Regions:
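Bacterial Sec-dependent N-terminal signal peptides
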Residues: 17-73, 435-436
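Intrinsically disordered, low-complexity peptide-like regions
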Residues: 3-4, 8, 35, 43, ...
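Generic signature of intrinsically disordered, low-complexity, basic-rich segments
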Residues: 10, 34-36, 40-42, 50, ...
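Sec-dependent bacterial lipoprotein signal peptides
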Residues: 1-20
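Mature extracytoplasmic or organellar-lumen-exposed domains after removal of signal/transit peptides
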Residues: 62-436
Length: 436
């Protein structure tokens, strides 16, 4: 194996990290940097930058391990991948969201599903009832842990509003200030909205993409604080397994992060080549973003980063692992940003029609509402913070869903406020309003 290198340039200072390599991976660094130092690479070629200048750096990075084509990892003939707990929580969350569309559901039932206790008959699936897992204690408890209580209150408030306001008006036609049903033009889908035009089930569904899925993955399981906890680094170096298991702690943590996204995939080993799932959370919208020509390749890129990071964990290549985690954070966060802007733009375009289809507008804006809420759980790997803080997100929501001063949410939102919010989101995530 040859001695090869990574080149990283931060704030104009170049540093070299040498790795043993057996596989070549091309990485394009597109950011512009100001170079003020002389950088010399001496192996077979020499690159010298001697002037202060703005340059775009493109380099070939060689890594010291193979990246498998699928998410299949074994040890002594046994799989080392396990994320059944994540699949369980996704199933619980999905059934809870479904219950929000059944007007016979009580608030006690919804809250019990959210805060499931082992053995309670909260779900239609006996295995879920027998489980000690629950959704509530994994909601908003990582990157936004200081806001965890407020986040759970938000979710429970939407559930309560659905039961108290929407269910009693299930057969009433909605109007400004009054909950009820509203049908899309041409005999399309019937939507059930609250007094301000919001579909509470969509708010809960899309908010959980951030508060449960993204938060657990990006701000929890794939962070150095989690992966390196205890003696994990030393244990991974010698591949010390968890008692009675085929995997190490670090491998399992990485897989648990993977499970929150791919836990309901039809083929969890190869969900890109063999797409399909009954997921209603992150994985579903990865597929939707990937189908947009402006973001084609997103699904493959994200899954490859998961495979690369997992392979790096096996080899105890922790810098490569963290680089893959950063790639995952950027790509998964982008999915949330793209869909938030997309739905706000769709609502704005709908309102601009000569005869707006308000049911369609409300549906788009309800989905957008939940995705905007989820932005507080994203992670910008360059800053180590979300792309928008909770305070910034709540301020944005107050503009796209105004409910003060007698205003009635989506009934009164303006096209300009929707376009401004969509543009602000697009700019932060590095795309344009037109791309959305």
């Amino acid at each position: 194996m040859n001695l090869l290198k990574y080149i990283f340039i931060y704030g104009g200072i170049a540093s070299l990290i040498f790795l043993l390599s057996c596989e070549e991976e091309t990485v394009t660094v597109t950011e512009e940097v100001i170079v003020t130092d002389t950088v010399t690479i001496t192996e077979t070629d020499t690159l010298t930058i001697t002037e202060t200048d703005t340059v775009t750096v493109t380099d070939t990075v060689l890594i010291g391990f193979a990246i498998p084509a699928t998410y299949l990892f074994t040890r002594d003939g046994d799989t080392t991948v396990s994320y059944s707990g994540q699949t369980t929580r996704l199933k619980m969350a999905k059934e809870m969201v479904s219950a929000l569309k059944d007007e016979t559901t009580t608030i006690a039932k919804l809250l019990a599903m959210f805060d499931h206790q082992e053995g309670a008959s909260d779900f239609s699936d006996a295995d879920l009832n027998a489980s000690s897992k629950q959704v509530k204690n994994k909601t908003g408890n990582n990157g936004t842990a200081t806001n965890a209580a407020a986040i759970r209150v938000d979710l429970e408030a939407w559930m309560t509003n659905q039961v108290d306001s929407v269910f009693p008006a299930w057969t009433d036609e909605a109007s400004k200030g009054l909950a009820g049903y509203i049908q899309e033009a041409g005999g399309g889908s019937t939507r059930y909205v609250n007094q301000n035009g919001l579909e509470n089930n969509q708010a809960v569904n899309k908010a959980l993409i951030g508060a449960l899925v993204a938060d657990q993955v990006l701000n929890g399981y794939l962070t150095p604080a989690k992966l390196n906890s205890g003696t994990n680094e030393a244990d991974q170096a010698v591949q010390t397994k968890v008692d009675g298991k085929s995997y190490t702690n670090m491998e399992h943590y990485w897989d648990e992060g993977y499970g929150y996204i791919y836990g309901l995939a039809t083929d969890g080993i190869d969900p890109v080549t063999t797409p399909g799932s009954n997921d209603i959370f992150m994985l579903k919208y990865i597929g939707k973003v990937d189908s947009d020509p402006d973001f084609s390749g997103t699904a493959g890129e994200l899954h490859r980063a998961f495979r690369e990071g997992r392979a790096a964990v096996v080899e105890a290549e922790f810098e490569a692992r963290d680089a893959a985690a950063h790639h995952i954070a950027k790509t998964a966060s982008l999915v949330i940003g793209v869909r938030a802007a997309h739905y706000l733009k769709a609502g704005q375009i709908g309102l601009a029609a000569a005869s707006p289809d308000m049911a369609g507008v409300f549906h788009d804006l309800s989905e957008g509402f939940g995705f905007v809420y989820s932005i507080q759980f994203t992670l910008n790997p360059e800053t180590g913070a979300p792309y928008f803080s909770r305070e910034e997100v709540m301020e944005m929501l107050s503009k796209i869903y105004p409910t003060t001063g007698g205003m009635r949410g989506f009934w009164d939102v303006t096209q300009s406020d929707l376009q401004e919010a969509a543009t602000t989101i697009a700019t932060a995530f590095g795309f344009t309003y037109e791309n959305a």
